[in-house]
């Protein structure tokens, strides 16, 4: 009767680290393969260097033109005047909008900065 996967795994669990290392080397030699972690690990690193597909528009300070900033926040978020005022009067930093395309976020940032606010894109 052939050995099952579960039996192999159980045997591996009982082995010491140096024994596992020797086993990997023996498998590499026997089958002519290389167990390389570096190749598999390189792919996610490339993905993290890609430009983000969504960002958040975060206001770090209101500036001197509070009324102008409230109007822009109202326009950008679609909330009422009182809700926009609550957002602007809230504790900084405050997220104005999440999950925004980078191009749209840049436009929003430009409008808010023009109104006097300080903005970060995260």
UniProtKB/Swiss-Prot annotation:
InterPro entries: Ribosomal_bL12, Ribosomal_bL12_C, Ribosomal_bL12_C/ClpS-like, Ribosomal_bL12_oligo, Ribosomal_bL12_oligo_N_sf. One of its GO terms (biological process) is translation. It comes from the Bacteria. GO terms for molecular function: mRNA binding; structural constituent of ribosome. Keywords: Ribonucleoprotein, Ribosomal protein. GO terms for cellular component: cytosolic large ribosomal subunit. Pfam families: Ribosomal_L12, Ribosomal_L12_N. Belongs to the bacterial ribosomal protein bL12 family. HAMAP family: Ribosomal_bL12 (MF_00368). Forms part of the ribosomal stalk which helps the ribosome interact with GTP-bound translation factors. Is thus essential for accurate translation. NCBIfam families: L12 (TIGR00855). Homodimer. Part of the ribosomal stalk of the 50S ribosomal subunit. Forms a multimeric L10(L12)X complex, where L10 forms an elongated spine to which 2 to 4 L12 dimers bind in a sequential fashion. Binds GTP-bound translation factors. This is Large ribosomal subunit protein bL12.
């Amino acid at each position: 009767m052939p050995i099952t996967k579960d039996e192999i795994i159980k045997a591996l669990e009982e082995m010491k680290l140096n024994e596992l290392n020797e086993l990997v080397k023996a498998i590499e030699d026997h089958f002519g393969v290389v167990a390389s972690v570096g190749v598999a690990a390189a792919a996610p690193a490339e993905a993290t260097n890609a430009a983000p597909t969504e960002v958040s528009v975060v206001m770090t300070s209101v500036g001197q033109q509070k009324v102008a900033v409230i109007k822009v926040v109202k326009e950008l978020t679609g909330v009422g005047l009182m809700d926009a005022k609550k957002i602007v009067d809230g504790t900084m930093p405050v997220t104005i909008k999440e999950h925004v395309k980078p191009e749209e976020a840049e436009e929003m940032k430009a409008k808010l900065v023009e109104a006097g606010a300080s903005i970060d894109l995260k």
